[in-house]
């Protein structure tokens, strides 16, 4: 499942590491270019300790990074030298709950009082994030989840008459409604005539989003 949103909903801390920092060995792949393992804990100190343990090269995952794992639990920094950015479009979004907005602004003031430099930034591609995510992730999911056919992988329905029925009933029973919807959407965006219109375009938007985020981190921590 996700890391950051569930952590936010539960009032705890969640960290989604950089892709390849933590091995994905043992994970059931949903969308390979998005899937990442990360810790959820009550405090940042525990997050650092857990990340030290789970990060690093894994011979069972060729995508895992061979870069040295820092002593995250020993990291310290001068608050006054750190610049934090927040997206102004999020604060002014019409769907934002007033109570959440109020608490968010209170947290900004709290961080400023602690010595952090906090500034608003604009992120024009904000409204494209969800659509881009769904196109790319469902496309990858339709491919990854195709292996769960009830024969080689996944749940197998026992009361079947032939191989074709085994495939149909196993996948129909083994997958939930949301998973089925995502597989169907992914199959659609990868189909002939729609691949360039949806999947290729979403890849280009993701590249623009990546470039924009990298530009932000040139000025902020």
PLM regions with names:
Residues 1-11:
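FAD-binding core of FAD-dependent oxidoreductases
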Residues 87, 121-124:
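Conserved beta-strand termini and adjacent loop/short-helix elements that scaffold enzyme active sites
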Residues 89-93, 126, 190-191:
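A short, flexible beta-alpha/helix-coil linker loop
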Residues 78-87, 139-210, 214:
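Short helix-loop capping/hinge segments that flank enzyme active sites or metal/cofactor-binding pockets
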Residues 17-20, 27, 39-45, 49-60, ...:
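Generic secondary-structure signature for well-ordered alpha-helical cores
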Residues 98, 130-139:
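Short glycine/threonine-rich loop-to-helix capping motif typified by GTGT followed
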Residues 71-72, 96-122, 153-155, 165, ...:
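Acyltransferase
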Residues 13-101, 165, 169:
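A short helix-breaking turn/cap at a secondary-structure junction
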């Amino acid at each position: 499942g996700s890391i950051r949103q569930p952590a936010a909903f539960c009032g705890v801390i969640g960290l989604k590491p950089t892709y390849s920092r933590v091995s994905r060995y043992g994970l059931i792949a949903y969308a390979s270019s998005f899937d990442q393992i990360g810790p959820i804990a009550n405090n940042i100190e525990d997050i650092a300790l857990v990340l030290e343990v789970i990060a690093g090269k894994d011979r069972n995952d060729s995508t895992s990074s061979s870069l040295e794992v820092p002593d995250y639990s020993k990291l310290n920094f001068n608050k006054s030298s750190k610049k934090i950015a927040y997206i102004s479009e999020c604060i002014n979004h019409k769907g934002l709950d007033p109570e959440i907005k109020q608490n968010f602004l209170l947290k900004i003031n709290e961080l400023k009082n602690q010595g952090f430099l906090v500034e608003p930034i604009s992120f024009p591609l904000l409204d494209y994030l969800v659509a881009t995510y769904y196109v790319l992730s469902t496309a990858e999911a339709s491919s990854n989840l195709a292996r769960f056919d009830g024969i080689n992988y996944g749940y197998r329905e026992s009361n079947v008459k032939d191989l074709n029925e085994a495939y149909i009933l196993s996948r129909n029973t083994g997958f939930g409604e949301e998973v089925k919807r995502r597989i169907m959407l992914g199959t659609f965006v990868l189909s002939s005539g729609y691949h360039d219109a949806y999947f290729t375009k979403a890849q280009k938007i993701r590249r623009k989003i990546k470039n924009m985020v990298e530009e932000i981190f040139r000025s902020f921590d």
